[in-house]
Amino acid sequence: YNLLIDDCCLKERVHRKRMRGYMTENPENKAQIVYFSHGGGPLPILGDPGHQKMIEFMTALPAQLRKPDLILVVSAHWEEKEATLLGAEFPPMFYDYYGFPEEAYRINYPAPGSPDNSKRIAALIAKEHIPTKLDPKRGFDHGLFIPLKMMYPKADIPCLQLSLLRGLDPSAHIALGHSLRELLQENILIIGSGFSFHNMQAFSWGNENREDPANDAFQDWLIDVCTGNHTQQEREQFLVDWENAPSARYCHPREEHLLPVHVCQGVANKPAKLIFNDRILGKRS
């Protein structure tokens, strides 16, 4: 599923596009924060039928957003001991997938980086006593370039990427989100790029939509935690204790695709709005 966690400019016309969710204006913050499932490797760009609903959603979403001055992506596909930001002025492409047709390795997303903003955001993180560093060599991985190629194909917005923390401690990722709260007053789009269901053996690679009660149970739990009537303290504790959720380890044998939710929720400090709840590769996501 996809969540809008904070926004001040989305229009109600989103309903006319038949996307599920409710969008409300929030004059307090300029930042926009979204968590979404980014799909299976390069398959959305290759036109895979199992991603059709996602492709339609992702290509339509920017029309509902104010164009940001900067995009910060927390990608499930990057883990470091320290919170690490890309530091290159023009990050290269990092094709962190294998076994796909040759065209998957010709995908290009030539968006500029922003070294000055990387340094500034690293300083915000470090101020909260979280070790941080810049990586001037690493490129954009597919957690960034696949969704953004659908959303902003002109690649004309500076993009930064922030790593997860090795060890995958949920509390540490909520704290990482807390460290970014000063960004809420800026015209920045913060994206948590993961997958709310990520069991590679359970995906329907033949694009069949079969009922899966375990998948449904976890998705319903996660939607309630992120959008339901809970205090922020309760919400964060649920996310810390996510392994207690129904079918948690079935849906996430390893939690790297879930943890961008924790970062986004830590930044926003408020309930989210559900904006997509459909099937990707046969699973509710």
Feature-to-residue mapping (PLM):
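Cysteine-centered motifs
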Residues: 8-9
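Basic polycationic patches enriched in arginine
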Residues: 13-20
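A short aromatic-anchored loop/beta-hairpin motif
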Residues: 24-124, 128-132
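Beta-strand elements within well-structured catalytic alpha/beta cores of enzymes
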Residues: 32-37, 70-76, 162, 183-196, ...
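Long, well-ordered alpha-helical scaffolding segments within enzyme catalytic domains
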Residues: 53-64, 171-186
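Flexible, glycine/proline-enriched loop segments at strand-loop-helix junctions
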Residues: 104-112, 163-170, 248
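Internal, conserved structured core segments that host functional sites
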Residues: 118-174, 179
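Surface-exposed, charge/polar-rich loops and edge strands
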Residues: 123, 127, 158, 168, ...
